[in-house]
Amino acid sequence: CASCHSMKYVSYRNLFEPGGPEFTEDQAKAIAAGFEVTDGPNSDGEMFVRPAKLSDKFVMPFANVKAAQAANGGAYPPDMSVLAKARSGGVDYIYSVLLGYEDPPSGVTLEDGVYYNKYMYGNNIKMSEPLSDGLVEYSDGTTASKEQMAKDVTTFLMWAAEPHLEARHKMGFRAILYLIILTILVYFSMKKIWSRIESEV
């Protein structure tokens, strides 16, 4: 996916944060170092190229929109940072598109570089089928079926759309627990105060 699609709202440091893909910090650093970014200016006033760091956003595969369109038959690959939330149907739609490639029905003619996808709007897509059985190897021996890989891709994209979702859920739980305890304390405090008032009356 990264060869065509950008993820401009995700940083390399997100890869080892809680709730993410569970890389170690060293692994995330190694992934970042595999890409180069333009930085600067330096002390001479010139821009320079350096390996990416954890604080950098994911490196874009193309320099600009025009370059991306030129490399993809005029189509601009959408940014995948928030794709799971931006598209109607979310991850279910993305999962279906990844597995929706098939031969066009009889009588349907496609232009060169266009593929038939039964779940894509208009049934035409310029992205070739990205998944095939056995494309990757899982360290735990999981069978690399198209369905399994599509599930993994959509799970990753859902995380990328909200990398801090788990942290927010934990914070929300703590806030609710705090409010419950506070409510109980206030209730018993008020009950004690009113019992004194009633006894005096």
List each model region and its residues.
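The canonical Cys-X-X-Cys-His
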Residues: 1-8, 153
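Acidic helix-start/capping segments at beta-turn-to-alpha-helix junctions
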Residues: 9-33
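Membrane-proximal low-complexity regions enriched in glycine and acidic/polar residues
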Residues: 38-122
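Substrate-binding/catalytic groove segments of enzymes
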Residues: 89-92, 103-108, 126, 134-138, ...
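Extended, hydrophilic extramembrane loops/domains of integral membrane proteins
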Residues: 121, 127-162
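Juxtamembrane interface at the cytosolic side of transmembrane helices
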Residues: 168-173, 177-201
